[in-house]
Amino acid sequence: MSAATDQILDQLKSLSLLEAAELVKQIEEAFGVSAAAPAGGMMMMAAPGAAAAAEPVEEQTEFDVVLESVPADKKIAVLKIVREITGLGLKEAKDLVEAAPKAVKEAIAKDAAEDAKKRIEEAGGKVTVK
């Protein structure tokens, strides 16, 4: 490499990430180019994988109800609901509630998951459905 290119390379190495991003934008504008990946081979290979990954999300039929957290003053109410939903004994349900975040029910139908979420939230727990 020439001295000029060595000097440019050294200057590029010293740029912060923000400065490098700004430089890329300026180069794109100045030369009318794009730093995005070409629309050829790599993108074509990634597209079917991305489409296949998107399909299961649209057709998801099984959901997990995850208890994220329980305020201390609501623990007993949430514990009762968890016992009703899961059919667990008192000790097992207590262990589950205290181990939050933890899955309460797994691989259940959407309506059952939404119902469980609603009941636990009404009792005071924080829940997510995945």
From Swiss-Prot:
Q: Name one Pfam family in it.
A: Ribosomal_L12_N
Q: Which UniProt keywords apply?
A: Ribonucleoprotein, Ribosomal protein
Q: Which Gene3D superfamilies match?
A: 3.30.1390.10, Single helix bin
Cellular component annotations (GO), alphabetically ordered: cytosolic large ribosomal subunit
InterPro entries in the cross-refs: Ribosomal_bL12 (IPR000206), Ribosomal_bL12_C (IPR013823), Ribosomal_bL12_C/ClpS-like (IPR014719), Ribosomal_bL12_oligo (IPR008932), Ribosomal_bL12_oligo_N_sf (IPR036235)
Which domain of life does the protein's organism represent? Bacteria
MF terms in GO: mRNA binding; structural constituent of ribosome
Q: Does the keyword Ribonucleoprotein apply?
A: yes
CDD domains per the UniProt record, alphabetical: Ribosomal_L7_L12
Q: Name one GO biological process term.
A: translation
* Subunit: Homodimer. Part of the ribosomal stalk of the 50S ribosomal subunit. Forms a multimeric L10(L12)X complex, where L10 forms an elongated spine to which 2 to 4 L12 dimers bind in a sequential fashion. Binds GTP-bound translation factors.
What is the protein's known function? Answer: Forms part of the ribosomal stalk which helps the ribosome interact with GTP-bound translation factors. Is thus essential for accurate translation.
Similarity-based family = Belongs to the bacterial ribosomal protein bL12 family.
PANTHER family registered for this protein in UniProt: 39S RIBOSOMAL PROTEIN L12, LARGE RIBOSOMAL SUBUNIT PROTEIN BL12M
Q: Kindly provide the name given to this protein in its UniProt entry.
A: Large ribosomal subunit protein bL12
Q: Which organism is it from?
A: Nostoc sp. (strain PCC 7120 / SAG 25.82 / UTEX 2576)
